[in-house]
Amino acid sequence: MEPVSRAVEETNRRMLRARDAMDRAYAQPLDVPALARIAHVSEAHFTRTFRATFGETPHRYLQRRRVERAMFLLRETDRSVTDICFEVGFGSPGTFSRTFRDIVGRSPRAYRREATTMPVPTCFTMAWLRPNA
């Protein structure tokens, strides 16, 4: 294997390690310094490489991950929007609603109303039923 290929492979492995940590601990406070430590790279290198690897910033990935989980909870539970907001890791209902609307295109409450009449694709449901291990 060429040295360049090994370097790229190692970089990908480090970025996947950080993304996996984000997937497991999405509801916890995560920041770039902590994620860079997980990937064993500098903060600037982490942000640049994560974006190049996954097509979005670490912050945006984490927001999207949290919103995806919130979508599931809004569809499948009757818990309040505020409870869901805090469970998925947002610090305030206002930030949650703005981010949700930005990503989904409607408010959490509107999504819940509409989601009760829409079928859920099996592949999406199965992704949320897998264990967190």
Model-inferred region functions:
Residues 60-64:
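Short, basic-rich loop-to-helix N-cap that marks the start of a DNA-contacting helix
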Residues 1-45, 52-53, 57, 69-133:
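Alpha-helical bundle regulatory/interaction domains
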